[in-house]
Regions:
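Short, cysteine-centered beta-strand-loop-beta hairpins and adjacent loop/turn segments enriched
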Residues: 109-115, 132-137, 194-195
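"Short basic amphipathic alpha-helical interaction patches in structured regions
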Residues: 115-122, 139-148
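Residues in well-ordered beta-strands of folded domains
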Residues: 101-105, 128-130, 190
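Hydrophobic residues positioned within well-ordered beta-strands of beta-sheet architectures
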Residues: 100, 123-125, 185-187
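Small/polar-rich, solvent-exposed N-terminal microdomains that initiate assembly or binding
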Residues: 1-113
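Short acidic, glycine/tyrosine-flanked loop/strand segments centered on an H-E-D-like triad
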Residues: 120-136
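Short, solvent-exposed beta-strand/turn "edge" segments of beta-rich domains on protein surfaces
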Residues: 93, 112-120, 178-180
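Acidic-leaning, charged glycine-interspersed low-complexity segments
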Residues: 141-195
Length: 195
């Protein structure tokens, strides 16, 4: 059963469970989980990012590269998880560490292609970066600044995320939570040509 809603121009259809006959939601939204998994895959390939996330000491970047098991523990559900495919991180106050979480938002049909097809959409892919204030300083600079730089290097301009199109930074804002004991950034990558 389709749920139909009207947008501000009263002519945009948003279908919740129907597809275009090729297994794809008409707005391309059925692949959110796959896109997040692919983004995590790209992030964990960045050795400097993994060191900054895993080691809570000022010399994090001069520490040894992480083992596959250490990286796996950072993304697997459990007490050592530091990379989440959703925004909420419940164990902030229990450990002095850094976290990455993500979400997708503001997806809508791309106006430029609307005359031809409603299968093209645009939206934002948000990455949230947080570090405990007690481990913020490193020998090379502020931890969250360095993490932001490595996330940017890993994802900006990337065009291989499962049909997601080319990513480009659209917005970046400071982010402070838990009574300012954790700080960092949110960075929004604009998805330029979802199909």
């Amino acid at each position: 059963m389709a749920v139909e809603a009207r947008g501000p121009r009263n002519d945009v259809r948003f279908l919740s469970d129907e597809n275009d006959g090729q297994g794809m939601n008409l707005l391309g939204l059925s692949n959110f989980t796959k896109w997040k998994q692919e983004a995590v895959s790209k992030l964990i390939q960045n050795e400097n990012l993994m060191k900054l996330m895993y080691y809570d000491t000022p010399d994090a970047l001069s520490k040894p590269a992480l083992t596959e098991e250490q990286v796996s523990n950072m993304v697997a559900p459990g007490k050592d998880q530091q990379i989440f495919q959703y925004r909420h991180v419940s164990n902030l106050a229990t450990k002095q560490t850094s976290y990455i979480s993500m979400e997708l938002a503001y997806f809508k049909p791309l106006e430029e292609y609307r005359l031809f097809s409603e299968q093209y959409v645009s939206g934002l892919f948000y990455i949230y970066l947080l570090s405990d204030i007690e481990i913020m300083e490193t020998n090379q600079g502020i931890r969250t600044d360095l993490i932001l730089k490595e996330v940017y290097r890993s994802l900006d301009g990337l065009d291989s995320l499962i049909g997601m199109g080319k990513l480009g930074v659209e917005t970046q804002l400071p982010l402070w939570v838990d009574n300012n004991s954790f700080g960092g950034y949110s960075i929004g990558f604009k998805v330029s040509d979802l199909k």
